[in-house]
UniProtKB/Swiss-Prot annotation:
Cofactor note: Binds 2 magnesium ions per monomer.
Residues annotated as binding Mg(2+) 2: 224-225
Ligand binding (5-phospho-alpha-D-ribose 1-diphosphate): 79, 82-83, 87, 89-92, 107-115, 119
Name of the protein: Anthranilate phosphoribosyltransferase
Record family assignment: Belongs to the anthranilate phosphoribosyltransferase family.
Coiled-coil intervals, chain numbering: none
GO BP term, pick one: L-tryptophan biosynthetic process
Keywords: Amino-acid biosynthesis, Aromatic amino acid biosynthesis, Glycosyltransferase, Magnesium, Metal-binding, Transferase, Tryptophan biosynthesis
Cofactor(s) named in the record: Mg(2+)
InterPro entries membership: Anthranilate_Pribosyl_Tfrase, Glycosyl_Trfase_fam3, Glycosyl_Trfase_fam3_N_dom, Glycosyl_Trfase_fam3_N_dom_sf, Nuc_phospho_transferase
Function per UniProt: Catalyzes the transfer of the phosphoribosyl group of 5-phosphorylribose-1-pyrophosphate (PRPP) to anthranilate to yield N-(5'-phosphoribosyl)-anthranilate (PRA).
Length: 341
């Protein structure tokens, strides 16, 4: 590890293979917590490259719990966090809208790290059992159409690093790579990131991971979601080509809303917001979810255009299908599920 730390101190980039090897060291018991903290801080200060991100993702996926089945059409819409905006759980709420529109959603997430309420905190508050095995997750994806993958359970080697991340209390490469380490073999992905200069590198990593289609967004105000506040910067991966574009919410019929107006709170407060959106209540929360779910449906290929994606998302909510998916997941996640090993 010392050789890698020296390179980072000197501002040098690591190769993909060096980062892969460093990642395996980070996940081992043969490294001091001080070395882990130093590595994460130095890497953040230098700035992460696509090769470094992919190298670490390779190490994490290698050490993750194995999934035996390929779930056709599986998608994730996990964001990085780390934007400091304290918004409600936009991507988790949107996940049920996607499922209601017929997408199989493998929602990868965690408890709060730099926010008040993480996806795991919200889902527990709503009554979802987040402690599912890979076999149970496969079952839920096939039979319910949505499942939650609790990151610490999927990545047991990360437990010590999670403690160090919490103590550091600053965004690190692990915020960036969280959405990229989903152990399910995803076909498509919608990723929100808090660092605009990482749009292309993250898209390049998704390409290396073999995603058929993907969309990476950095929202107005550097939100790790699409925002109604103003212009959103987007990179689209389709047909193995990467294209940059911008998304103005007003073009799709939404009024501009400041990010401060979609702040969330604790898990109880955020659960109330999510239930309100899924129940069809008109609000700025609903409009934010419609924009994000619409973009995700476009990224998935379920919709040919963003406009069509927003229309499908609206129908998912107003037909009651999105809320039905939540209720079905709550019930099914507590049943004794068939385990596919």
């Amino acid at each position: 590890m010392n050789s890698y730390l020296r390179k980072l101190v000197e501002g040098q980039h690591l190769t993909e293979e060096e980062m892969y090897e460093a990642g395996l060291l980070l996940l081992s018991d043969n490294i001091l917590e001080s070395e882990v903290a130093a590595f994460l801080v130095l890497l953040k200060a230098k700035g992460e490259t696509a090769e470094e991100i992919y190298g670490l993702v390779r190490a994490l996926r290698e050490k993750a719990l194995p999934f035996s089945n390929h779930i056709k059409g599986a998608m994730d819409n996990c964001g990085t966090g780390g934007d400091g905006a304290q918004t409600f759980n936009i991507s988790t709420t949107s996940a049920f809208v996607l499922a209601g529109a017929g997408v199989k959603v493998a929602k990868h997430g965690n408890r709060a790290v730099s926010s008040k309420t993480g996806s795991a905190d919200l889902l527990e508050e709503l009554g979802v059992n987040i402690s599912c095995t890979p076999g149970e997750i496969d079952y839920l994806l096939e039979n319910v159409g949505i499942a939650f993958l609790f990151a610490p359970a999927m990545h047991p080697a990360l437990r010590r690093i999670m403690k160090i991340r919490k103590e550091l209390n600053v965004p690190t490469i692990f915020n960036l790579i969280g959405p990229l380490t989903n152990p399910v073999n995803l076909e498509t992905q919608f990723v929100g990131i808090y660092k605009r200069d990482m749009l292309l590198p993250v898209a390049e990593v998704l390409q290396k991971l073999g995603r058929k289609q993907a969309l990476v967004v950095n929202g107005s105000g550097f939100l790790d979601e699409a925002s109604l506040q103003g212009e959103n910067h987007v990179v689209v991966l389709k047909d193995n080509e990467i294209v940059e574009m911008s998304i103005d919410p007003e073009k799709y019929g939404f009024s501009r809303v400041k990010n401060e107006e979609i702040r969330g709170g604790n898990s109880k407060e955020n659960a109330k917001i999510t239930l309100g959106v899924l129940s069809g209540e008109k609000s700025v929360y609903r409009d934010t979810v419609l924009l994000n779910a619409g973009l995700a449906l476009f990224a998935n290929g379920r919709a040919e255009t963003i406009e069509e994606g927003i229309t499908l998302a609206t129908h998912s909510i107003d037909s009651g299908k999105a809320l039905a998916k939540l209720n079905l997941l709550i019930a099914a996640s507590h049943e004794k599920l068939e385990r596919v090993n």
